[in-house]
Amino acid sequence: MRSFASDNNSGVHPLVMEALNRANIDHSLGYGDDKWTEEAVAKIKETFTPNCVPLFVFNGTGSNVVALQLMTRPYHSIFCAETAHIYVDECGSPVKMTGCQIRPIATPDGKLTPELMQPYLHGFGDQHHSQPRALYISQCTELGTIYTPEELKRLTDFAHLNGMYVHMDGARIANAYAALNLSLKELTVDCGVDILSFGGTKNGLMMGECVIVFNKDLQSEARFIRKQSAQLASKMRYLSCQFTAYLTGDLWLKNASHANAMAAKLRAELEKLPEVTFTQKAESNQLFLILPRPVIDRMLESYFFYFWNEEKDEIRLVTSFDTTEEDVDEFIGLLKR
């Protein structure tokens, strides 16, 4: 069943599947001591910086937990937007695994600013308070919005000035860079991000993420934290080989650009309908809008999508690398009936 529910619902890109098949031909050493992982590590270092440490993990929550453990101790606090994945959608895993307090901050568009963070930065050195240590941001945000390089640099400078590390959740990072027409390095390393969760599952991979540690002070313990967090794959090559395919020939960019283009087409058609009200600026492959409840109920009979705020009749529509123009046309056609 085709849907606009999530980019997690899409399949695996054929080139990624070919890479998996090639990795499956013969036996290989486990736990990353294989040529496939060696190639993927080299590709990631070529893309970002030779000085990074890439760690392949199973999923997004795992990557976030590994990254945040590297940055914190249990008496620290982690700052994030109130819509952040680590606060809303990870079943308390970051709290359990780090022991840290999470401080959610209200934001109208999913993006944080120094001004929004400033009122929460207190208690430094006070033994009665959790000590601020990590800033978690998403690129794209959970509301589909995108940080510009200027916004990111201002935010990371502010965090570092206050003794905090910056972790970027890049589950949909490709969609952000496709929208801004910038390289992956320009919006991570060059903006002062300390650790990146580099995602691909939502953009054509079968599974897996990569924790990329840029900050040298956080690199030495990374392998041990990954193992302790149950994120070390014995058959590592099936995770790593996907990233080589993903970063070859700009497949990541082509997939994300197509998803963004399909979202733009869907948005353009929806804007023609008087009953549609958008609640967020449409910048990537996620659309947030309000429809009359009877219309939503009727559409759900044929298409699956998620409510974002059921009380307000707000829904989320997500396109992916394999969304077609026919998918968009059929959805709009049904909506107009």
Give the location of each predicted region.
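Hydrophobic beta-strand scaffold residues
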Residues: Q101-I102, V166-M168, F278, F305-F307
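Active-site C-terminal subdomain of aminotransferase-like
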Residues: D109, P132, Y136, I146, ...
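Active-site pre-lysine segment of PLP-dependent enzymes
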Residues: P149-D157, L161, R172-V193
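Conserved N-terminal alpha-helix of the aminotransferase class I/II PLP-enzyme fold
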Residues: H13-G60, T83, Y87, S93
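PLP-dependent aminotransferase-like
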Residues: T72-Q131
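Active-site phosphate-binding strand-loop segment of PLP-dependent enzymes
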Residues: F4, L112-G170
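Conserved C-terminal alpha-helix-loop-beta "cap" of PLP-dependent enzymes
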Residues: P74, A264-K336
